[in-house]
Structures are given as structure tokens and as C-alpha cells.
């Protein structure tokens, strides 16, 4: 590449020589050998910068003239006066080309030519230097040799290659590290986990991974709640299996610790209507909450007392304080379940079993305190310890009679407290269970109440049984398909944005298929979605009848409808399926063009979306462009309708033998009498009047 540039630069010198020869033959004869010498020397010498020499010095010292016209050994630094002189020279040359010549001295011409050559050499020299440096830089990047000479780029080179000095130094440092360093960089484990697994912030309401983590924390919490009383009272923890219990406890503690250090400080929260996702703010919010204090209290290491008192599960009783995660898991799980009442029933049953479990443990502790088998009231030591105590707890809390009478004062006080707490707790749980089941069946009860009121109303006014049957069928089908009788009332309390989101998910795919609304404003389509009403028709119901005034347009959401016609009005002309539209002509027509042209009957159960004319006009007031587009489409539909109605249907049979009669001329109709024949007397009278007037 550099060789080709050198050849190209050498081709410039003869042009300069010819210019100088025109201006001064003697000067050209002196400069040509020096230029050749300068080129030969420049190939041997390295690149360097020199300051420009003046015209007088170049003629006083002939040896220095080689550096004056050299392409490699000259870097200009002209004065502002020289630039002004060059500008004036170019203007004079332009005026010379236009034909206006001015007298110029010989010395001025030689000086101008020298300045032009200096500027040309300066730019070409700078270009060659930059190309060499760029080539060396690319070569170093490709080869990546250890002893490759480094190229020091100047500020002009950095600007020309669009590489800042800071970026170039960073790239050189990186290449140096890649070449000479063989040790891989170590990433801390904490930073690795933060990048690969844990996000900076967690949305507790939408993140399912966080829900799974809460499930794991809930399992650890239930392990402590259910098994700590058993280990504390029953002789199930022995020196043989003590290590297994300790290992399980350590695993639960690790789960607690990870939840406090890694998960909870990343939970997003809302402050002033804004969702906070900053890491420092999230940590500060968690550390200032009551939840953090309870979590820290639940993880205090009281197990160090094992050294003084031995392994006793009582020192792990503080693990039960982490109840906030348990209730948070229940809340999030109920919010995503389709039938949350099922989980509520299971959870309430779990509460009841846990209370019975605690009562069984307390009864065994009281029996052990009094002495196993010492009286009839205490546990006699036969059979499975836990099952016998649990059975006694069930009979006590549910207040089932037939229990042995307490003998000692301790037994009497214990039984009194047990009965009192049992009645209170059991009645509370039964009431909560009733509320859960009642909330689960509230909609069904509402539907049944509505049906009872409607049937009572129809019986009051002696409505025929056929109509009552159809009403019952409509109510049952609507409830079974939608689980609600009126969808509009359900969404009234929601904001408009949420109503639009729900409507988009349900009906947008249907509206998008309608050819009538294609090309309309998207916001207008959104407004239409909010105004659509869903209506269910039974099999055989007339959606609209021929000749009635049309005020609604219908979009089929589910099911099919049939368009009837023919002489008797019972012939099925076409069957419309989901996504089809009918009634749009009556909705968009003006004047008397809004009459229904056919009967439309539901074929099976059909769910139709209806849009009335008044609502559409209110919407189109805000969208004039869409209104014009719909009016054009309405005209096209009306014209197509007119063509179809004006078309003469083909006659069956040999129609060519009996062609249709031509229409009677209008003038002839005037002269026809009541009998349909021409009145000759009237014709004669008219002829006489014309002759008398002439």
C-alpha cells in the first residue's frame, strides 16, 4: 500500500515541474535534479519533521533544496501571511481563467509556485505518515507478537481513526495482559452469585421464583413449628439420632440466613406511588422494618448454650418468630390460584390439626409430670405415645364426653384450661370454616337467588311454561359459560386502563378480523372495545327480523347464526360463524336505508357483541378521519346492496320462448284509459285543436 502511494506521489512532481517551467525555465532546470536526489535520500532516511524554509534560503543553499520539494522529509508549518498569499494567488488564477488578466511580476510568480508545492508536499507527507501508522497498528493487532514494535499515535492520528487516547491505552494494556499474563482473573463468589442468580430487585407479586423460595422458607418454618414441641416433650431425640436432628436444624438455619441476607433486602416496595428498585433504598427499607427485627430475633444463636446445658430443643424456640414469611406465602399463593377457597379450607384444617398437635404434646408433658400411669386421667404408657395423646386432645377440644375425671388439683386446673381454650378455639375455627365455604359459594348463591326471583315473577303473571323454560335455559347456560350474569357490572369499579386491558385480551382478536374497521384509528378501536356489550341467544332466537329498523351492529363472538330468505322466509341463505359481522349497513346508513333486509336466527347457542348506532356516532365525533373512512365503506356497501336488489333473478325453464315484456313508454301511459286501451276520441280532439289554432 505504501509503495503504490509513493508511485502516486512521484507522479505529482512532473506536474509541478511543468508549472515551474512555464513560470521560470531556469528555476525548473535547477529544481529537477534536486527533487530526484531528495526522493532517493528520503527512501533511506526515516520519517521526521522539519520546519519550512523560505524561498530565499532555498536559492542561497542549493543542498537544502532537496528537503524543500521532498514528499517524505517535509512537514509544513506555514505562517498566516503565507496562507493569505495562497488565497490571493488562487483568486488571481480564477480571474485569469475567466479572461481578466492582471500584470504579475516574475518574483511573485515564483514565490506563489513555491508555496503551492510546500502545501502539497505537507498534506501528502501527513497522509503517508498516518497511513504508515495505521498499517502498523493493524498489523500489530492481527499478529499479536510479543516483540512487535509499538506505534505511538499522535493526537491527529487518534482523531482520524476515531479512537480516543484513553481507549487506545486501554486496548494496549489489555493486549499486554493477554500476552504476558497467564493467571485467570478470580471473580468473588458473592459477585458471581449476584450476576448469575440474584437480580438487583425482586417483584414479590409477579416473580414466581420468589414464590418458590417462600415455599422453601415455609417448609423450614413448619419443620420448626411442628417438630420442636415433639422433640421437647416426647423421647424421640436420642443420642443415636442426635446428629441427624442437628444437621436438619443447620439446613433450616441456612435457609433462614439466606432469606435475611440475599432475598429480603431485594424486595421492591412502593413509596409515594413510585416503585423503588434502588439497591440501597431496598436494603434501608428492609432494615428499618419490623419484619427485619423478627427475622433477626428468629436467628439468634442460642444453640451456643448446648455447651453448658447439652442439646436441648428449647434453645431453638425462637425459630418460630419467623411467621411473617409463612403468612406472606399464603397471601401470594391465594392471589394466583384459580380457586383460592380450596386452599383456604386446607389452611384452616391445618390450623386445627396444629392446635390438636400442641394439645397432645402438652397432655403428654402433664402425664410425664404427674407420672405415667399414676392415675386414670394421665397417659397409661400403653400403645403409641403420640397417637394416644392426640386422640385424647381431639376428644377434649371437641368437648366429647366419656373422659376420665381428673384426680389431683393440677389435673383439675389443667382440664379446666383445656376445656375453656378448646371451646373458644374450636368455635373460632368452625366459624372461619363457615366463612370460607360461604365465600366460595357466594356467586352460586347469588345466581340461585336471581333465578328464584325471576321464576317467582313469571309465576305471578302466569307466563307460559314454554317461555319459562327458555328463560331457565338462558340463565343456566349463561351461568355455566361465564359464571356471571352481567359482565359490565363486574368491571365497573376498575379503572378505565384496566378495563381496556381486559377488553383487549378478550375481544381484540375478534375486532381485528372485522373488515369494516380495518384502517381505522387504533384508539377508536379501543373505545369501541369498551362500549361493546355481550348478549347470549338461545337456539332459534331471532337476532333481527326483516323490515325492522336497525339500530345495532352484531359481531359473532361464539356460535353461529343463519340468514334466512326465500319466498317463505325459511330458506337458509348463508351461515355466519365466529368473527363475522352483520347489521353494519343499517348502522351506517342514513335516512330510510336502515331497514333490516333479512331475518337472522341463532343456530345453537350464540354469543354476540352488540354496538348500537348512538354509541358509534358518539365515538366517531372524536375521530373524523375514521368517520370519513367508514362513510366511504358504507357507500360501497350500499351500492353493492342496490346492485343485488336491482338484479333480475333468472327464470326457471325455457325463458327464451317467453321473453319478458318491455316497459310501456311514458307518453303512451298518459293516453291510456282506465281500461288500458288508447282513447281514439281523445286523439281526434287533440288533432282538431291543432288544426283550428293553425
Curated annotation (Swiss-Prot):
Tissues in which the UniProt entry reports expression: Small subset of retinal photoreceptor cells and testis.
Catalyses which reaction(s): Ca(2+)(in) = Ca(2+)(out); Na(+)(in) = Na(+)(out); K(+)(in) = K(+)(out); NH4(+)(in) = NH4(+)(out)
Site feature Central gate, where: 426, 430
BP GO annotations: visual perception
Keyword Repeat: no
Binding site for 3',5'-cyclic GMP: 583-584, 596-597
SUPFAM superfamilies cross-referenced by the UniProt entry: cAMP-binding domain-like (SSF51206), Voltage-gated potassium channels (SSF81324)
Cyclic nucleotide-binding domain as annotated region, ranges: 522-638
Region (Selectivity filter): 399-402
Compositional bias ranges of the Polar residues kind: 26-40, 153-168
Matching PANTHER family: CYCLIC NUCLEOTIDE-GATED CATION CHANNEL BETA-3, CYCLIC NUCLEOTIDE-GATED CATION CHANNEL SUBUNIT A
Protein name listed in UniProt: Cyclic nucleotide-gated channel beta-3
Species in which this protein is naturally found: Mus musculus
Gene name for this UniProt entry: Cngb3
Amino acid at each position: 500500500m505504501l509503495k503504490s502511494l509513493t508511485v502516486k506521489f512521484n507522479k505529482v512532481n512532473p506536474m509541478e515541474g511543468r508549472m515551474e517551467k512555464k513560470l521560470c525555465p531556469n528555476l525548473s532546470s535547477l529544481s529537477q535534479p534536486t527533487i530526484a536526489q531528495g526522493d532517493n535520500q528520503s527512501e533511506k532516511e526515516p520519517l521526521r519533521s522539519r520546519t519550512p524554509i523560505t524561498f530565499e534560503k532555498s536559492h542561497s543553499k542549493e543542498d537544502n533544496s532537496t528537503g524543500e520539494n521532498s514528499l517524505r522529509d517535509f512537514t509544513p508549518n506555514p505562517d498566516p501571511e503565507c496562507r493569505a498569499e495562497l488565497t490571493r494567488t488562487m483568486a488571481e488564477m480564477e480571474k485569469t481563467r475567466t479572461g481578466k488578466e492582471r500584470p504579475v511580476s516574475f518574483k511573485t510568480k515564483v514565490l506563489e509556485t513555491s508555496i503551492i508545492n510546500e502545501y502539497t508536499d505537507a498534506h501528502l507527507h501527513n497522509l503517508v505518515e498516518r497511513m504508515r501508522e495505521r498499517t502498523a497498528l493493524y498489523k500489530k493487532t492481527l499478529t499479536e507478537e510479543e516483540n512487535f514494535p509499538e506505534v505511538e499515535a499522535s493526537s491527529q492520528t487518534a482523531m482520524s481513526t476515531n479512537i480516543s487516547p484513553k481507549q487506545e491505552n486501554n486496548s494496549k494494556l489489555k493486549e499486554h495482559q493477554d500476552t504476558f499474563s497467564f493467571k485467570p482473573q478470580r471473580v468473588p463468589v458473592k459477585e458471581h452469585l449476584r450476576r448469575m442468580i440474584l437480580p438487583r430487585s425482586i417483584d414479590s407479586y409477579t416473580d414466581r421464583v420468589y414464590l418458590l423460595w417462600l415455599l422453601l422458607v415455609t417448609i423450614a418454618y413448619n419443620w420448626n413449628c411442628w417438630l420442636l414441641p415433639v422433640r421437647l416433650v416426647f423421647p424421640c431425640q436420642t443420642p443415636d439420632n442426635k446428629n441427624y436432628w442437628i444437621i436438619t436444624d443447620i439446613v433450616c438455619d441456612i435457609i433462614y440466613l439466606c432469606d435475611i441476607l440475599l432475598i429480603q433486602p431485594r424486595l421492591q416496595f412502593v413509596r409515594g406511588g413510585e416503585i423503588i428498585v434502588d439497591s440501597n433504598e431496598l436494603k434501608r427499607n428492609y432494615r428499618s422494618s419490623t419484619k427485619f427485627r423478627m427475622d433477626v430475633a428468629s436467628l439468634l444463636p442460642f444453640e451456643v448454650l448446648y455447651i453448658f446445658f447439652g442439646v436441648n430443643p428449647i434453645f431453638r424456640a425462637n425459630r418460630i418468630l419467623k411467621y411473617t414469611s409463612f403468612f406472606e406465602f399464603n397471601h401470594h399463593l391465594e392471589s394466583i390460584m384459580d380457586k383460592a377457597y380450596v386452599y383456604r379450607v386446607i389452611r384452616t384444617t391445618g390450623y386445627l390439626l396444629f392446635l390438636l398437635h400442641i394439645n397432645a404434646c402438652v397432655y403428654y408433658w402433664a402425664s410425664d409430670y404427674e407420672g405415667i400411669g399414676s392415675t386414670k386421667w394421665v397417659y397409661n404408657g400403653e400403645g403409641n405415645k403420640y397417637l394416644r395423646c392426640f386422640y385424647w386432645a381431639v376428644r377434649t377440644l371437641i368437648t366429647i364426653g366419656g373422659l376420665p375425671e381428673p384426680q389431683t388439683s393440677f389435673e383439675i386446673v389443667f382440664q379446666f384450661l383445656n376445656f375453656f381454650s378448646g371451646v373458644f378455639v374450636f368455635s373460632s375455627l368452625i366459624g372461619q370454616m363457615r366463612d370460607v365455604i360461604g365465600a366460595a359459594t357466594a356467586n352460586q348463591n347469588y345466581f340461585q337467588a336471581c333465578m328464584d326471583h325471576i321464576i317467582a315473577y313469571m309465576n305471578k303473571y302466569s307466563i307460559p311454561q314454554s317461555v319459562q323454560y327458555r328463560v331457565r335455559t338462558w340463565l343456566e347456560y349463561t351461568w355455566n359459560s361465564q359464571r356471571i350474569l352481567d359482565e359490565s357490572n363486574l368491571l365497573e369499579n376498575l379503572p378505565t386502563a384496566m378495563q381496556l386491558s381486559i377488553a383487549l385480551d378478550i375481544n381484540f382478536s375478534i375486532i381485528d378480523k372485522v373488515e369494516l374497521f380495518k384502517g381505522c384509528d387504533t384508539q377508536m378501536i379501543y373505545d369501541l372495545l369498551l362500549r361493546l356489550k355481550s348478549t347470549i341467544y338461545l337456539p332459534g332466537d331471532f337476532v333481527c327480523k326483516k323490515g325492522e329498523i336497525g339500530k345495532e351492529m352484531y359481531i359473532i363472538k361464539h356460535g353461529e347464526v343463519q340468514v334466512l330468505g326465500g319466498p317463505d322466509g325459511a330458506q337458509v341463505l348463508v351461515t355466519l360463524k365466529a368473527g363475522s359481522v352483520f347489521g353494519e349497513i343499517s348502522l351506517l346508513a342514513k335516512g330510510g336505508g336502515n331497514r333490516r333486509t333479512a331475518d337472522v336466527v341463532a343456530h345453537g347457542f350464540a354469543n354476540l357483541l352488540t354496538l348500537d348506532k348512538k354509541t358509534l356516532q358518539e365515538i366517531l365525533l372524536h375521530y373524523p378521519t375514521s368517520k370519513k373512512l367508514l362513510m366511504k365503506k358504507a357507500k360501497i356497501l350500499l351500492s353493492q346492496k342496490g346492485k343485488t336488489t336491482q338484479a333480475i333473478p333468472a327464470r326457471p325453464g325455457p325463458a327464451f320462448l317467453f321473453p319478458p315484456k318491455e316497459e310501456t313508454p311514458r307518453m303512451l301511459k298518459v293516453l291510456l284509459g282506465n281500461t288500458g286501451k288508447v282513447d281514439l276520441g281523445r286523439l281526434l280532439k287533440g288533432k282538431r285543436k291543432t288544426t283550428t289554432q293553425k
